[in-house]
A protein has these predicted regions:
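Helix-enriched interaction subdomains in cytosolic or periplasmic regions
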Residues: 6-42, 142, 299-302, 309-320, ...
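A short, basic/flexible loop-to-alpha-helix module at the beginning of a structural domain
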Residues: 39-58, 93-96
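Conserved N-terminal Rossmann-fold NAD(P)-binding element of oxidoreductases
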Residues: 61-64
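Hydrophobic/small residue at the entry helix of a nucleotide-binding pocket
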Residues: 68-69
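Adenosine-cofactor binding site in Rossmann-like domains, unifying the SAM/SAH pocket
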Residues: 84-97
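Rossmann-fold NAD(P) dinucleotide-binding segment
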Residues: 96-144
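Rossmann-fold dinucleotide-binding core
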Residues: 137-199, 205-208
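An accessory alpha-helical subdomain
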Residues: 198-331
C-alpha cells in the first residue's frame, strides 16, 4: 500500500473525531494530535524503505544527481531497492558507458540547460525510460521524444527538495511515449505517498505561468519594494497580524533560495512575460480607482471577483483560518 491513502486517512480522522466527541474531548484537539503523529510517521517511513515494484529494472541514471532534487530522487529510488548511478558535469566523457545498460535515465538539471542536456545524451537502450523533472514541460518533452525512440515521461514534482516526505505531495506527469512501459514508475511514486496528476505539456505550462511564474514574480517585486523602501523588518513582525506574518514568511522564503532557479522559472517562456504584463496593466487599472477615489467602482470590482471565486472563497477562508491558527501558535 502507498504510505498515504487519502480515503484511509479521512476515514480514520472522522472515526477518531466521533469518538472524541462521545468522550467529551475536543475533536479538533484530537485531529491536531493525530495529524502531527501521521506527519512524523510519514517522515519516518523514509528511513525504512519502500516496496520495489520493478525488481528487474536495470540501473537508474540521474543526470544532475548532485543537485537537490536529483539527490531526493536518488534517495527515494535507493530506499525502494533500485541501483542508482549519477552523471554529473565532469562525467560526460564517460556518459556512454554510464548509460549503456540503463533501465531509466532521469534528467534533473536547471531549466535553462534541460533541453541542451537532453540533446547531449548518448544513445540509450531501446527500452530505457527517459524522464525529466523540469518545471516547464513542452520543450523538454519534445526534446526527449526527438532524442530517444523508447519510453518517454515528463515529471514535475510540485514541492521542494526539503519537503522531508513525499506524502501528500503532488507530482504532475505528462505522457510522452509508451506509457505502459513506465506505469510501474508512476505507481512507485504513489507508493512513496505522492498524489499524481496527469495533464498535457501545453496545459501544464499554461497553468504554471500562474502557479509559478506570475506568483514568484509578484513575490520578487514585493520583496524588492520592501528592500528599496528599507522598512524595519523587526518592527513589521512585531506589529503584524498572523496573516501578514505568514505572507511575509512566504516572501522571505523566496529570497532564502537559489535566484537562478527563479530566474529560470519566470523567464522560461515569452508567455510568462505576456501574462506578467497583463497583471501589471490590471494593477495600474486598480491604482486608477484609488486615484479617482472611486470607492463604488472598487466595491463593484471586488464583488465581481467574489462572484468569480464562488464557493471557493468560503472554502479558502476556512482553510486559511486553520493555517493562521497554526502560524499564530508558532509565534515567538
Amino acid at each position: 500500500l502507498p504510505i498515504y491513502v487519502p480515503e484511509r486517512e479521512a476515514s480514520m480522522l472522522a472515526s477518531r473525531r466521533k469518538e472524541a466527541q462521545a468522550l467529551g474531548v475536543s475533536p479538533d484537539l484530537i485531529e491536531d494530535v493525530l495529524r502531527r503523529v501521521m506527519r512524523e510517521s510519514y517522515s519516518s517511513e523514509n528511513d525504512k524503505g519502500f516496496k520495489t515494484l520493478q525488481p528487474n529494472l536495470r540501473p537508474v541514471v540521474i543526470v544532475g544527481g548532485g543537485g537537490q532534487m536529483g539527490r531526493l530522487f536518488e534517495k527515494m529510488l535507493t530506499l525502494s531497492g533500485y541501483q542508482v548511478r549519477i552523471l554529473e558535469k565532469n562525467d560526460w566523457a564517460r556518459a556512454a558507458d554510464i548509460v549503456a545498460d540503463a533501465g531509466m535515465v532521469i534528467v534533473s538539471v536547471p531549466i535553462h540547460t534541460t533541453v541542451e542536456t537532453i540533446g547531449r545524451l548518448p544513445p540509450l537502450p531501446a527500452d530505457c525510460i527517459l524522464v525529466d523533472l523540469a518545471s516547464v514541460k513542452a520543450e523538454p518533452l519534445q526534446a526527449m521524444l526527438a532524442a530517444h525512440q523508447g519510453p518517454v515521461l515528463g515529471l514535475h514534482p510540485m514541492f521542494g527538495p526539503d519537503s522531508g516526505s513525499l506524502a501528500k505531495q503532488v507530482v504532475v506527469y505528462c505522457d510522452g511515449r509508451q506509457p505502459e512501459a513506465y506505469q510501474w514508475f508512476l505507481e512507485q511514486i504513489q507508493v512513496w505517498g505522492a498524489r499524481l496528476h496527469r495533464i498535457s505539456a501545453v496545459e501544464h505550462d499554461q497553468n504554471m505561468a500562474f502557479i509559478q511564474a506570475l506568483r514568484h514574480f509578484a513575490t520578487f517585486a514585493y520583496g524588492l519594494h520592501l528592500a528599496e523602501e528599507n522598512v524595519r523588518l523587526e518592527q513589521l513582525l512585531a506589529l503584524s497580524s498572523p496573516i501578514y506574518r505568514l505572507e511575509l514568511a512566504m516572501v522571505g522564503r523566496l529570497f532564502a533560495q537559489d535566484p537562478q532557479l527563479y530566474a529560470d522559472i519566470i523567464m522560461s517562456s515569452e508567455n510568462n512575460l505576456a501574462l506578467i504584463k497583463r497583471y501589471y496593466q490590471r494593477f495600474g487599472e486598480a491604482i486608477g480607482l484609488l486615484e479617482q477615489g472611486d470607492k463604488q467602482a472598487f466595491i463593484d470590482s471586488f464583488r465581481k471577483v467574489e462572484h468569480w471565486f464562488g464557493d471557493y472563497a468560503q472554502r479558502f477562508q476556512s482553510e486559511s483560518r486553520t493555517l493562521l491558527r497554526q502560524a499564530n501558535d508558532n509565534r515567538q
